[in-house]
Swiss-Prot record:
One of its GO terms (cellular component) is Ino80 complex. The lineage of its organism: Eukaryota, Metazoa, Chordata, Craniata, Vertebrata. Its main location: nucleus. InterPro entries: INO80F, TFPT. GO terms for molecular function: DNA binding; protein kinase binding. The gene is Tfpt. This is TCF3 fusion partner homolog. The modification Phosphothreonine is found at residues 172, 203. Interacts with NOL3; translocates NOL3 into the nucleus and negatively regulated TFPT-induced cell death. Component of the chromatin remodeling INO80 complex; specifically part of a complex module associated with the N-terminus of INO80. Appears to promote apoptosis in a p53/TP53-independent manner. There is a cross-link at residue 222 (Glycyl lysine isopeptide (Lys-Gly) (interchain with G-Cter in SUMO2)). Pfam families: INO80F.
Length: 259
């Protein structure tokens, strides 16, 4: 009996020592009396109080954000600058292409005019024309503006006074000497008119100029347009047309081949 009571007492004591208090969960005792946990808590407190807490992280984040913003603005500025330079380069390339195309066009026109000039010179030389010794005046006018008539020393003394009210183009037509050839037949002429064939129908621009006896003596060719004649008015008997046999019978000339 005593042995049984002693065993029951030991069992009761051992159960109370290793059992958790009522109402609490079963937990193991802390190792080394809880010194490790206390040291960790003290270290954590020291880590927070060492200056690397929330304020330090916030300042560092703000600096990084500001640096990223500066880099982003610089990249955007560089992108816009490169785009503007690219557009300007494309515009310059287009202008250069247009200028080069215009130069090629002018070169083709110049080559064609040179071929025409050489062809006309050969034809006139074959007919024995003295176009190299002739003198004439070329009046250059801008489109839409009245050019000033500057007489050359060769024809300044031969200008009659009745031509002062004429336009430069009419004055040039009215001041030709009867012995000088038509405009465009000189050595520096760029375009030369061809004489019409005998018996061919003439347009108003190519019709022969009607000349009077007084006009030949004064070296003045009177044109019907300068006097303002009407179409139904009859001309004086002194105005006679040139005889067909006095016209130079230039045949029809074929154009030279062009490139």
């Amino acid at each position: 009996m005593e042995l049984e009571q002693r065993e029951g007492t030991m069992a009761a004591v051992g159960f109370e020592e290793f059992s958790a208090p009522p109402g609490s969960e079963l937990a193991l005792p802390p190792l080394f009396g809880g010194h490790i946990l206390e040291s960790e808590l003290e270290t954590e407190v020291e880590f927070v109080s060492g200056g690397l807490g929330d304020s330090g992280l916030r300042e560092r984040d703000e600096e990084e954000e500001a640096a990223r913003g500066r880099r982003r603005r610089q990249r955007e500025l560089n992108r816009r600058k490169y785009q503007a330079l690219g557009r300007r380069c494309r515009e310059i390339e287009q202008v250069n292409e247009r200028v080069l195309n215009r130069l090629h066009q002018v070169q083709r026109i110049t080559r064609r005019l040179q071929q025409e000039r050489r062809f006309l010179m050969r034809v006139l030389d074959s007919y024995g024309d003295d176009y190299r010794d002739s003198q004439f005046t070329i009046v250059l006018e801008d489109d839409g503006s009245q050019g000033t008539d500057v007489p050359t020393p060769g024809n300044a003394e031969n200008e009659p006074p009745e031509k002062e009210g004429l336009s430069p183009s009419q004055r040039t037509t009215a001041t030709l000497d009867p012995t000088s050839p038509a405009p465009g037949e000189g050595p520096s002429g760029r375009k030369r008119r061809r004489a019409p064939r005998v018996g061919a129908s003439l347009t108003p621009e190519l019709a022969p100029v009607q000349v009077g006896a007084e006009g030949w003596g004064q070296g003045v060719i009177k044109v019907e347009e300068d006097f303002g004649f009407e179409a139904d008015e009859a001309l004086d008997s002194s105005w006679v047309s040139r005889e067909p046999d006095k016209l130079l019978p230039y045949p029809t000339l074929a154009s030279p081949p062009f490139d």
